[in-house]
C-alpha cells in the first residue's frame, strides 16, 4: 500500500500541495482526479521521490521508497511523461540499458516488450514511434521489476481504441494480482470503467477519497426514467405523490427525481393503481464526468466562458 500523509510541496515561495493525505490500497485501482493545474503530476513526482517534499511523508508498505535502495524497481514502477527517450535508440536497446542499470535480466526486458505488444518493432528507432507506442514502451519500463506498486500518469494518452481497451485490461489485471495501482486520466469515462476508488484533488488540496460507487452516489437524488403509453394521464396522476420532481424530455419520456429512496416502488404502485401501460422504467445515474465537474467546480484554475446568446 502507498500511504501519503500531510504531503506539502513548494516551488520557490509558492505552495502547490497543501497537506495531502490519502492511500492507495493493494489489490485495487485508485483513480487520481483533479482539474488541470490541481497538482496531480506534482503529487506523483513527490510520491516517487523525483521532487523534494516540503513536509509530510510517503511510504510504500510502511517504508519510504529510499529505504528499499536496490529493490526500488521491484517496489515501484511508474509511467510519467514519455519524453525521456534517446530518440536514436531502438526500443530494445532502450529497455535493455535500463534493465542492466537496475540489475534486471535482459530476458525480462524482452519479456516486457512482448507484454506491451512491441516485440515486433523492438529494433525500430524510438524517434519513429507514435505517441501511443511510446506510452507502451514507457509501460514496459515501468513493469521491468515486476513492481508491487504502479503509478501511471495519463497512460491511455495517444492510444487508439484497441490500445485503450488493452491498457484498461492490463491495469485491472495488475490490481487483481495484488498490486496497488494509482492512475490519473482526463478521460473520465475510461476512468469510470477502470478504477475501484477515487482520490480527488483541487488546487493542491484533497477534495475527497471515495469508492467509485460512493462518489457516483454523492449528492445524487434517485432518478427514474419512464415511458408510458399515455404520458399526459400519468403526469396528472403523479400529482398525488409528494416530494417528486418531474421533467418531461423532448423524446416524450418522463424523468422523476426524489429524495425518497423508494421512488421506484412509489412510481410502480402508481402505474399499477392507474392502469398505466409502462413501456420503460429505468433508474438513472449521473456519470463520472458530471460528478467530477460538480465536485471540482470551485477548484478550477480557469474556466471556459460560455458565449452562447451573446
List PLM regions with ranges.
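C-terminal coupling/interaction segments
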Residues: 259-310
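ABC transporter nucleotide-binding domains
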Residues: 2-4, 9-202, 208
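Alpha-helix N-cap/helix-start and coil->helix boundary motif
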Residues: 92, 188, 213, 231-233, ...
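Short glycine-/small-residue-rich flexible loop motifs, especially phosphate/cofactor-binding loops
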Residues: 96, 110, 171, 235-236, ...
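Short, surface-exposed acidic/glycine-rich loop or hinge patches that mediate macromolecular interfaces
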Residues: 65-66, 70, 103, 229-231, ...
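ABC transporter nucleotide-binding domain
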Residues: 168-258
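Residue-level "edge-of-site" marker
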Residues: 112, 126, 251-252, 284
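Short coil/loop linkers at secondary-structure junctions
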Residues: 51, 105, 119, 244-245, ...
